[in-house]
Swiss-Prot record:
Keywords: Aminoacyl-tRNA synthetase, ATP-binding, Cytoplasm, Ligase, Metal-binding, Nucleotide-binding, Protein biosynthesis, Zinc. This is Cysteine--tRNA ligase. Zn(2+) binds at residues 27, 207, 237, 241. The gene is cysS. The keyword Zinc-finger does not apply. It comes from Helicobacter pylori (strain ATCC 700392 / 26695). Binds 1 zinc ion per subunit. ATP binds at residue 272.
Length: 465
């Protein structure tokens, strides 16, 4: 298994800290709004990583957090006259619904930052004791990055423009010094009583503490195998996580760092500041979650994905082929490449090379259908074919529906009954040899985007886009 390590900037063999086990921490959302396609892409990318590792024989522990203490949450909660707990719980539920619709496997653990305040305070106390952290006059506590000789080694970022994003404070020793603890500033602020005084943790200390509490190994030079997240988190978030972990514990946070690429909308980076965010819940109004998942996984996870509906509909054809084959093999069977599972898994073991994996999948679908055409009555390989289709489901998280349910997505029960009535009416017209009437019914349904297919078992139908 090979993965691309952001820190080394190259593909490297995956060699876990504990044989046949993989510990992964994925930075989850700050829960002050609904999930957008960038959140969905990150979740799907590392869901693919997890599935690939599991099918390669690893026991995977994947933790994805919720940041439920943050300035954005506080500001929105104040604006909407809610507590931060009320607001964050709304968006945690929304995020969970969206990811369930995208068939993302539930993490092993989903810690909330608010549940690990003691660990955060303890880590900050350690940094103060080591004289690596310092307090300014308003009570805020910062980490002195000059004490970490390896600061910047992950992101190779030293741009003053980037440091400007962090915000300049007059008493900070260096521009890149980052806040560990924000002291309580009075009304409209949120604070928790602690040995550090009343206040709340900074963003970066939250994730490091949760890694340490949920996944960290003892007596190793690294705390976990893989730390993952979106490319936008590389700096300053992941750089600062790595820094404070070295300073507090004398170890590296992760052996490997993985980052997924951005989602662009009309060739422009998707962001709330640009007003072009595309929420998952809105996309799900137009497309089934499996169709959306199939599209988002179709571009290599490290590449930028330029979202557009034309490409989404093109990618849906791949999903159609999977279900078309599944539909055929459930009744009529033929042969399939016996090395298919090995070949497609090897593609995914090469830094999640999904493009190559999908090429192997396309080849399998094509060759299997050809064999079915040549020998439609061969049932000897039914188990093998269905097992390979099941493998696609487990590896890529697609192809798990019943074919009839997939091809009839977006059709209500009352509409289904009307279609079945029309099919029965058409059948009677053909029995009377009233072929004009039969053709008119077919044309009528086509206008409703319903295609009819006559098979030896009877007429079946499907909805098209």
């Amino acid at each position: 298994m090979f993965i691309y390590d952001t820190k080394l900037k190259q593909k490297v063999p995956f060699e876990p800290l504990v044989q046949n086990k993989a510990n992964i921490y994925v930075c989850g959302p700050t829960v002050y709004d609904d999930a957008h396609l960038g959140h969905a892409r990150s979740a799907i990318a590392f869901d693919l990583l997890r599935r690939t590792l599991e099918l390669s024989g690893y026991e995977v522990m994947l933790v994805r957090n919720f940041t439920d203490i943050d300035d954005k949450i506080i500001n929105k909660a104040l604006k909407e006259n809610k507590s931060i707990q009320e607001l964050s719980s709304i968006y945690i539920e929304s995020y969970t619904r969206d990811l369930n619709a995208l068939n993302v496997k539930k993490p092993s653990l989903e810690p909330k930052a608010s549940e690990y305040l003691d660990a955060m305070v303890g880590m900050i106390e350690t940094l103060l004791e080591k004289n690596i952290a310092y307090q300014v006059s308003n009570g805020d506590i910062y980490l002195d990055t000059s004490k970490d000789k390896d600061y910047g080694s992950l992101s190779v970022h030293n741009s003053s423009i980037e440091f400007g994003r962090i915000g300049l404070v007059q008493e900070k020793r260096l521009e890149q010094d980052f806040v560990l603890w924000k002291s309580y500033k009075g009304d409209n602020d949120v604070g928790f009583d602690s040995p550090l005084g009343k206040g709340r943790p900074g963003w970066h200390i939250e994730c490091s503490s949760m890694v340490f509490e949920t996944l960290a190994l003892t007596n190793t030079p690294y705390q976990i195998d893989i730390h993952a997240g979106g490319a936008d988190l590389l700096f300053p978030h992941h750089e600062n996580e790595a820094c404070q972990t070295r300073c507090a514990f004398g170890v590296e946070l992760a052996k490997y760092w993985m980052h997924n690429g951005f989602v662009n909308i009309n060739n422009e980076k998707m962001s709330k500041s640009l007003g072009n965010s595309f929420f998952v819940k809105d996309a799900l109004k137009n497309y089934d979650g499996e169709i959306l998942r199939n599209y988002l996984l179709g571009v290599h996870y490290r590449s930028v994905l330029n979202f557009n509906e034309e490409d989404l509909l093109v990618s849906k054809k791949r999903l159609d082929k999977i279900y078309r084959l599944k539909q055929r093999v459930l009744g009529t069977l033929g042969g399939i490449n016996p090395n298919f599972k090995k070949e497609i898994l090897e593609c995914m073991q090469d830094d999640l090379n999904v493009s190559k994996a999908l090429s192997v999948l396309e080849s399998m679908l094509s060759s299997t259908n050809e064999k079915l055409d040549q020998n439609p009555k061969n049932k000897a390989l039914k188990g093998e074919i269905l097992a390979n289709l099941k493998f696609i489901e487990e590896l890529l998280g697609i192809g798990f529906k019943d074919p009839s349910a997939y091809f009839q997505l977006g059709v209500s029960e009352s509409e289904k009954q009307e279609i079945e009535n029309k099919i029965e009416e058409r059948k009677r017209a053909k029995e009377r040899k009233d072929f004009l009437k039969a053709d008119s019914i077919r044309e009528e349904l086509l206008k409703q985007k319903i295609a009819l297919m006559d098979t030896p078992q009877g007429t079946i139908w499907e909805k098209f886009f």
